[in-house]
Structure formats: C-alpha cells, structure tokens
Regions:
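Catalytic phosphate/metal-binding cores of nucleic-acid and nucleotide-processing enzymes, i.e., regions
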Residues: 1-124
Length: 124
C-alpha cells in the first residue's frame, strides 16, 4: 500500500507549496485592491480565459495585473510581454520575494503617460 504524505508537511521546493503561496498572494493583493476597485476578483474565480492570458485580476480597469510571489528571480519584461491585453489596458506586475516588500512594475511609457495625465489635471 502506498503511504500518503501529510499535506501540512510540504517541502520548501514542493510545487503544491509554491502554488498555495501564489494563491495566498493573489488573495492578499485582491484585499488591498478592494478599496480602490470594489468589483475586483481573482481571475481564477471570475474568468478562466483571463487567467490563461496571464491576467490575475478582473475589475481593475485600466490595469491588467499579474501577481507573482517567487523565491528566485522574476523576469518582469518577459511576464509583461506575455500578458495578452486589449487596446487601452495597462499591464502591471506585482511581485514579491520572501523577506522583501511587494514591487509594482510597469512599462516606462505607460508610467509616463499616466503620470503626465495626473500632472496636467493637477492631481499631483
């Protein structure tokens, strides 16, 4: 008979642990986005198609957001390039490494365009 491993005793390199950590990070980000975007949902819950396109949250227009909680390096350029977006969407990557604060990454052109709008409208 095959002996099953206890679920709570996952090794640090376990795929199940990494998956659970990623899902927990998505839930944490959603909780922080809710005051700004009350209709925000994870795409795992709301849209399998968006989840497959590398978009982790729905209801955050104009931003399309991917969340990554990683132990090793993340390649933001690759992740932002692989996100399948529509015209007018602004891709953003939230990524966190153990022991560090979460970082938001976006293309410089998108940042400049949005910051310019905020300055012109005297919001900043």
């Amino acid at each position: 008979m095959i002996k099953k491993r206890a679920r709570g005793n996952l090794s640090p390199n376990s795929g199940a642990k990494a998956r659970r950590k990623g899902h927990n990070f998505e839930r944490l980000i959603r909780k922080r986005l809710l005051p700004i975007y009350p209709k925000c949902q994870t795409s795992r819950y709301a849209s399998k198609m968006l989840d497959d396109n590398g978009i982790d949250f729905v209801g955050t227009y104009p931003f399309v957001i991917q969340a990554k909680h990683v132990e090793r390096g993340v390649n933001p350029q690759k992740i932002l390039s692989e996100m399948i977006i529509e015209k007018g969407d602004i891709p953003v990557l939230f990524h966190k490494k153990k022991g560090y604060r979460t970082i938001a990454t976006m293309w410089l052109d998108d940042w400049l365009e949005n910051t310019t709008k905020l300055v012109v409208e005297k919001i900043l």
